[in-house]
Amino acid sequence: MASKSWLNILTFLCGSAVGFVLCSQLLSILFEEQKDIQPSILHNDPHARHSDDNEQNHLEGQMNFDADASQHKDENTDIADKLYQKVKILCWVMTGPQNLEKKAKHVKATWAQRCNKVLFMSSEENKDFPAVGLKTREGRDQLYWKTIKAFQYVHDHYLEDADWFMKADDDTYVILDNLRWLLSKYNPEEPIYFGRRFKPYVKQGYMSGGAGYVLSKEALKRFVEAFKTDKCTHSSSIEDLALGRCMEIINVEAGDSRDTTGKETFHPFVPEHHLIKGYLPRTFWYWNYNYYPPVEGPGCCSDLAVSFHYVDPTTMYELEYLVYHLRPYGYLYRYQPALPEKMLKEVSQIYKNEDTNVNQEPLKEKHK
């Protein structure tokens, strides 16, 4: 009887062990599948991850989209060219020594070429890239220090070279032409800044760091002065929130960056995370952080989107192609809101000088 009892116990223990092993393997498989479906950016803390420095980069070398420019030789860019002259944007890109070749060079090869001036801000100087050395340490706890010092550097060296000053990450993709249209309605001498507006912790809201944000010249002046007079201090390592608190203290307005239809232009994730319904779980922090009611699916994003975040190098080039090269034959753009009245007159004059009789509607059709 005793031997039978021991046999039952042994059988139970063996069965439990086998069950545990099989269960562990099954859970491991499920977690791997979940990891593939929900990429690592889906942290439940909006400040838990910024730009990973240890991601695998599967892209060797840079790509030159200008190498095949023959199809664009007759492209009419008069309006974009006029905006480039009238709405001058200095872009500074937050990066690090280990990311210059992994990420920053792909920013440099794509959207950064459309900035009026671009600077890459790192903890160490690199004269070959080149990158500005801010003499900080690397790490998430240094993000706000890097931001403060970067804006101070820009203020001291390039204040008169631009009207607007944009901060972006080395995994952010920015459509500068759309940003210029957005900013063309505003005066850079007014204290205002734009980005993806979040609402917690700051009464007027603050701008998401990853989606990028842009300060008017007056906002930049006030920000730098605030650290000289101790109106603002390094109050937190959470860069975007800390900067937002400072902006509120110094009476810099958190601007509305939505387009004329109410759609968002700055996006804290890659396009598919906003476009695919159900991709971001309802328990995810994102749904509680948006200042304006968030939309998922095709209505999520403006046709004149300004930025996307968590863009790896391969996707950087994909977006470059989709934004500036892919066209459906035979279509005029369906959504192209008018320019401000003063700028519209200036652009119209270009066509008049070319003996083109232009009013606002033909102007929209001509710039495709």
Curated annotation (Swiss-Prot):
The keyword Cell cycle does not apply. Pathway: Protein modification; protein glycosylation. It is a single-pass type II membrane protein. GO terms for molecular function: glycoprotein-N-acetylgalactosamine 3-beta-galactosyltransferase activity; metal ion binding; nucleotide binding. Its main location: membrane. One of its GO terms (cellular component) is membrane. The chain crosses the membrane at residues 7-29. UDP binds at M94, E138, G139, R140, K146, D169, H309, Y310. Disulfide bonds join C91-C115, C232-C246, C300-C301. It is found in: Membrane. It catalyses: an N-acetyl-alpha-D-galactosaminyl derivative + UDP-alpha-D-galactose = a beta-D-galactosyl-(1->3)-N-acetyl-alpha-D-galactosaminyl derivative + UDP + H(+); a 3-O-[N-acetyl-alpha-D-galactosaminyl]-L-threonyl-[protein] + UDP-alpha-D-galactose = a 3-O-[beta-D-galactosyl-(1->3)-N-acetyl-alpha-D-galactosaminyl]-L-threonyl-[protein] + UDP + H(+); a 3-O-[N-acetyl-alpha-D-galactosaminyl]-L-seryl-[protein] + UDP-alpha-D-galactose = a 3-O-[beta-D-galactosyl-(1->3)-N-acetyl-alpha-D-galactosaminyl]-L-seryl-[protein] + UDP + H(+). Its cofactor is Mn(2+). Residues 30-368 are lumenal. InterPro entries: C1GALT1/C1GALT1_chp1, Fringe-like_glycosylTrfase. Mn(2+) binds at D169, D171, H309. Belongs to the glycosyltransferase 31 family. Beta3-Gal-T subfamily. This is Glycoprotein-N-acetylgalactosamine 3-beta-galactosyltransferase 1. It comes from Bos taurus (Bovine). The lineage of its organism: Eukaryota, Metazoa, Chordata, Craniata, Vertebrata.
